[in-house]
């Protein structure tokens, strides 16, 4: 019997919607990354994108434990000399709440073209509204 290898054109991708309200950031991100990779499926193949599409709602209400709300710092560099910028978790939630979940999940995905393709299937929204109703997403309880 030969080993099964999933083909990109035969992979069935479902759409799921997840409510991040009150969920712990890291625990939510690990499950999202696992489902974006497709590791929950029997036909998982490491070099093929077998994951599903995931819509995350209420990104502004995600929880962190301890004092990370004030202590966790996000860094980025503008590319110019002395251009290192930083923002706390609280500032990130106030400015761009979607980015917090995106950064957490992106760090858990593979680096390279396959990881970028997986990351494109993640749709994060700060509120309860999304524009993917035509895809008929199923509610996923994490």
Curated annotation (Swiss-Prot):
Belongs to the universal ribosomal protein uL13 family. This is Large ribosomal subunit protein uL13. CDD domains: Ribosomal_L13 (cd00392). NCBIfam families: rplM_bact (TIGR01066). The keyword Hydrolase does not apply. It comes from the Bacteria. Part of the 50S ribosomal subunit. One of its GO terms (molecular function) is mRNA binding. Keywords: Ribonucleoprotein, Ribosomal protein. This protein is one of the early assembly proteins of the 50S ribosomal subunit, although it is not seen to bind rRNA by itself. It is important during the early stages of 50S assembly. It comes from Pectobacterium carotovorum subsp. carotovorum (strain PC1). One of its GO terms (biological process) is negative regulation of translation. GO terms for cellular component: cytosolic large ribosomal subunit. The keyword Hydrolase does not apply. InterPro entries: Ribosomal_uL13, Ribosomal_uL13_bac-type, Ribosomal_uL13_CS, Ribosomal_uL13_sf.
